[in-house]
Amino acid sequence: MKKLILLTVVALMSVLLLAACGSGASKEVATTGESKEGNAEQGVSGILDTIKQRDKIVFGVKHDTKLFGLKDPATGEVAGFDIDIARQIAKEILGDENKAEFVEVTSKTRIPLLNKGDIDAIVATMTITEERKKEVDFSNVYFEAGQSLLVKKGSPVQSIEDLTKDTPVLAVKGSTSTINIRNAAPDAPVLEFENYAEAFTALKAGQGVALTTDNAILLGMASEDNSFELVGGTFTDEPYGIAVKKGNTELVDAINGVLDTLKSNGEYDAIYKKWFDLQ
């Protein structure tokens, strides 16, 4: 009888011990899960502190877009309107414009690189759209553009209405331009390229009758080769914004503050005139 009671007590203690261990393990997993979630939130909200501790801010910029971001093959330096705006953001946040670091992006790669954490912000002729707002957060508008057409001088194509099934149009992958041109000229074949340099080379080679993107970008191409011209005015509004990772309101607020400062102190106008006063 005593032996039976002893066995029963031992069995009961074993059950209680296992239950306690299971409860502790569950609690540890739950705590770990909460910790990971908290770290994820901190990773977004604490980005400004991270940038200051790192003492540099990494921007995704174009390397192939004259007037906005164009790399000089001889020096390796990137220059343009977007580059100067990015430098001013670094100057206001970190006290030195040279603390801006630049990583090449294209229309296709910029959001993936941002979401991977390879860059802190995108300053790369990026149009603010409702669809993109689902993936990233935008600053206030820092440049107003509109989509247009670039053609060889003397081309019969002088406006969007002249595009037909026999007039191939060139555009860049991942840009809003490809969507807009298909909506505006549904009969015209659209050939897509990886970047603007490839698209412009294809236009020069006669692979299409027109190249379409934002007028400010096309203006840079026309200034590079005066045998091409912009025609037909604009057929869309393309407001550019600086993009950051979704939920990163702290960095958006800081960038908006810098843009406000640049516009109030005249620095924005000086940068604009530097790149677009081409007369």
Positions of predicted regions on the chain:
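Extended ligand-binding regions for polar small-molecule ligands
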Residues: 22, 33-37, 41, 83-84, ...
